[in-house]
Amino acid sequence: MDELDRQLINRLQHGLPLVRHPWEALAEELGSTAEVLRLRVQALLDDGTLTRFGPMFDIDRLGGAFTLAALSVPEARFDAVAAQLEAMPEVAHNYRREHQWNMWFVLGCETPQGITETIARIEAQTGLTVLNLPKEETFHVGLHFPV
């Protein structure tokens, strides 16, 4: 990772410029070209430095529903259950944790009923109980990780 990569990551954590041609504006700001910056983002995704690049939506304002959920998965079944979840379009993230509840994921659906139905489907497919942790309150912390 070079200095341009660091500058790009730091800048993107605050979002793209809200203009007609955001990559061009960002390139001017960082002294590069739009094409170079797009290629850099792709390279950072490809090598695992970045795990995700995309918009953040306020699903409540869009009318959808989401929840944080967890499973307690026997180690011998972990990869198989992870593959089942990854095949579901409602599953946005899926992470291993060192805890009794060792598989954490986010569900996103069009309606709260969709969350209920998806949880029931996961439980039926895996034979495991889903720990459902719906959001009770929204906090905006302005999280930024300087690199």
UniProtKB/Swiss-Prot annotation:
Reported consequences of knocking out the gene: Insertional mutagenesis results in the loss of respiratory nitrite reductase activity in vivo and in vitro. Mutant strains synthesize a periplasmic cytochrome cd1 that lacks heme d1.
Function: Involved in heme d1 biosynthesis. Catalyzes the decarboxylation of siroheme into didecarboxysiroheme.
Lyase is among the record's keywords: yes
Superkingdom, taxonomy of origin: Bacteria
Enzyme Commission (EC) number: 4.1.1.111
Species: Stutzerimonas stutzeri (Pseudomonas stutzeri)
Record's protein name: Siroheme decarboxylase NirG subunit
Catalyzed reactions: siroheme + 2 H(+) = 12,18-didecarboxysiroheme + 2 CO2
InterPro entries reported for this sequence: AsnC_trans_reg2, HTH-Siroheme_Decarb, NirdL-like_HTH, Tscrpt_reg_AsnC-like, Tscrpt_reg_HTH_AsnC-type_CS, WH-like_DNA-bd_sf
